[in-house]
Amino acid sequence: MALLDLAQEGMALFGFVLFVVLWLMHFMSIIYTRLHLNKKATDKQPYSKLPGVSLLKPLKGVDPNLINNLETFFELDYPKYEVLLCVQDHDDPAIEVCKKLLGKYPNVDARLFIGGKKVGINPKINNLMPAYEVAKYDLIWICDSGIRVIPDTLTDMVNQMTERVGLVHGLPYVADRQGFAATLEQVYFGTSHPRSYISANVTGFKCVTGMSCLMRKDVLDQAGGLIAFAQYIAEDYFMAKAIADRGWKFSMSTQVAMQNSGSYSISQFQSRMIRWTKLRINMLPATIICEPISECFVASLIIGWAAHHVFRWDIMVFFMCHCLAWFIFDYIQLRGVQGGTLCFSKLDYAVAWFIRESMTIYIFLSALWDPTISWRAGRYRLRCGGTAEEILDV
């Protein structure tokens, strides 16, 4: 009996610690968003003396927004940069899109690389290798095909690249688009994702996604260059780790990494979340414990039980009140990341928020059930530590 009581006291203590940690994350991310995001960065050096940047753009396939997204990179207001467009397959329709833009912007230093170079199992690295090997500037900007920018995006990122900074990254977010699937994505990338992403970076944990990353090429070369990360599927995590291990700091751009894919659906979003969860579980096994208890409904039940055990409060009343507070703070977070008026109603937000929160356990269990992932037309079996092997169809 004494052992059971001790276990219950321990669980109650855990519940209160969880409460403090999660709400610190809420406050940290909201305050950081208000103070840092969507602000004009201070110019650290004269415009004419900004260092050159090599933009590496991995492309595969075409969606309705691809040409408009790509065109924003040809219209950057930056004194010295090159655009290196990378397409793996010779019959990829993205090649025609690239050629059209190369013809439209002859004054932009841009080249097209077709065929890639097989150096490992990561298809993105394989696609980028030829461009990386001939990149002529000291700063490398790897940016996904679905990202769109505004004219001063690169200037903002380079201004964050101060003396001891080795990597500048953008907080992933989603552009305003039509349909409920777009709303669901926007709610996730404006609430749950920035709460974890920002609070991790504020407290010193290196949390980086590779959607838009500006890095020092010499530091990457010291780590073995891009080829050193071809054995991983989550190459962005391991590149960031290699840079941090060499004593360099990270900085976050004041502008978000604006995803604007023209192809999206609820099933695509769900598959993406499952794939990301599988990668996190294999890279960071502690995710198995930490991730489920950091989500609203599970956390509210644990904390509600702790409050009932200590204060005899009604669990369901506490659960509902805690979820309501979470819901409100998430809306504040979302408005901060958006930096303006949302394109959907509060009712749309409420429905999308509830569905997203309800999906979390299914996503997590699905990730545990099957250790293989499908990505860029390939299938891979993940191994502990983040490496993977390609599954070849016989």
From Swiss-Prot:
Effect of H26D: Inhibits activity to about 10%
Catalytic residues of the enzyme: D236
Top-level lineage group: Eukaryota
Location relative to the cell: Golgi apparatus membrane
GO cellular component: Golgi membrane; membrane
Keyword flag rRNA processing: no
Consequence when changing D236A: Completely abolishes catalytic activity
Topological region Cytoplasmic: 33-195, 305-309, 370-394
Impact upon substituting H322D: Inhibits activity to less than 6%
Disulphide-bonded residues: none
Effect of H26R: No effect on activity. Decreased sensitivity to the inhibitor PDMP
Effect of H26N: Inhibits activity to about 50%
Residues recorded as bearing N6-acetyllysine in the entry: K117
Phenotype when changing G179A: In strain: Wistar
Motif (D1): 92
Stretches assigned to the Lumenal side: 1-10, 216-287, 329-348
GO BP terms, alphabetized: cell differentiation; cornified envelope assembly; establishment of skin barrier; glucosylceramide biosynthetic process; intestinal lipid absorption; keratinocyte differentiation; leptin-mediated signaling pathway; neuron development
Transmembrane residue ranges: 11-32, 196-215, 288-304, 310-328, 349-369
Sequence motif D3, location on chain: 236
Outcome of swapping G225I: Completely abolishes catalytic activity
UniProt xrefs under Pfam families: Glyco_transf_21
CDD domains with a match to the protein in the record: Glucosylceramide_synthase (cd02520)
Signal peptide location: none
Assembly and oligomerization: Interacts with RTN1; regulates the ceramide glucosyltransferase activity of UGCG.
Name assigned to this protein: Ceramide glucosyltransferase
Name of the coding gene: Ugcg
